[in-house]
UniProtKB/Swiss-Prot annotation:
Residues 231-252 are annotated as: Disordered. The gene is rpsB. GO terms for biological process: translation. It comes from Acetivibrio thermocellus (strain ATCC 27405 / DSM 1237 / JCM 9322 / NBRC 103400 / NCIMB 10682 / NRRL B-4536 / VPI 7372). GO terms for cellular component: cytosolic small ribosomal subunit. This is Small ribosomal subunit protein uS2. It comes from the Bacteria. Belongs to the universal ribosomal protein uS2 family. Pfam families: Ribosomal_S2. HAMAP family: Ribosomal_uS2_B.
Length: 252
């Protein structure tokens, strides 16, 4: 059974590309035709590419690595947050801060500051501080939460990135490439597919299209994490059985 159907892709409008004057010739192999000045994406290729990305992210999750969802354009923000949270993963949906990957040590310092402010608020420290200072601290906390809230539990670099519109998220893609982190992305007809390891040709501007593909990537991660859990449980069971066999052998 395929990961995604042509019907699902059509209903979500994944096949609508950009205007023909706004295109990247490198995307030619993924274009089916042109209609009323708009490129139509070949959904047969999209089905295949979604499957490739699905199995890759499932493998990443099975290996116990995290996946960072990135989509800061308005149409992607909610889906990126919702699907990353559903898969218990990390996300950036407000703005990519330069160095989020390549200077992760510094970013971790800002995350620690966010956690410190959150703890202060929870423990009632804000209640005893001067009002002016509390206003300033709350503003700092809100800003950090907006930009770093989705990665505050990310203790190490992710095993992969899932990106909506690599053209807009170019800095994130470049940082990942520099560090050798594979990139899975929804790539529209105006993007450069060469910058992406797992290209999913599709409409990156329609909310339903982004939601559909992001949800499939989240499904892959959830499936992979269940596989990782089963693998850990299986190994533990084998160790218990081996110990029991050794004890039996010693007694004999």
């Amino acid at each position: 059974m395929s990961v995604i159907s042509m019907k699902q892709l059509l209903e979500a409008g994944v096949h609508f590309g950009h205007q023909t004057r706004r295109w990247n010739p490198k995307m030619a192999e993924y274009i089916f035709t042109e209609r009323n000045g708009i490129y139509i994406i070949d959904l047969q290729k999209t089905v295949k590419k979604v499957e490739e990305a699905y199995y890759f992210l499932r493998e990443v999750a099975m290996n116990g690595q995290g996946v960072l969802f990135v989509g800061t354009k308005k149409q992607a923000q909610d889906s990126i947050r919702e699907e990353a949270q559903r898969a218990d993963q990390y996300y950036v949906n407000a703005r990519w801060l330069g160095g989020m990957l390549t200077n992760f040590k510094t970013i971790k310092g800002r995350i620690n500051r966010l956690k410190e402010l959150t703890k202060m608020e929870e423990e009632g420290v804000f209640d005893v501080l001067p009002k002016k200072e509390v206003t300033k601290l709350r503003a700092e906390k809100e800003k950090l939460e907006k930009y770093l809230g989705g990665i505050k539990e990310m203790k190490e670099l992710p095993g992969a990135l899932f990106v909506v519109d690599p053209r807009k998220e170019r800095i994130a893609v470049l940082e990942a490439r520099r560090l050798g982190i594979p990139v899975v992305a929804i790539v529209d007809t105006n993007c450069d597919p060469d910058e992406v390891d797992y290209v999913i040709p599709g409409n990156d501007d329609a909310i339903r299209a982004v939601k559909l593909i992001a949800s499939k990537m989240a499904d892959a991660i959830i499936e992979g994490r269940q596989g990782e859990q089963l693998s850990v449980e299986s190994t533990a069971q084998e160790q218990v059985e081996e110990t029991a066999q050794e004890e039996t052998a010693v007694e004999a």
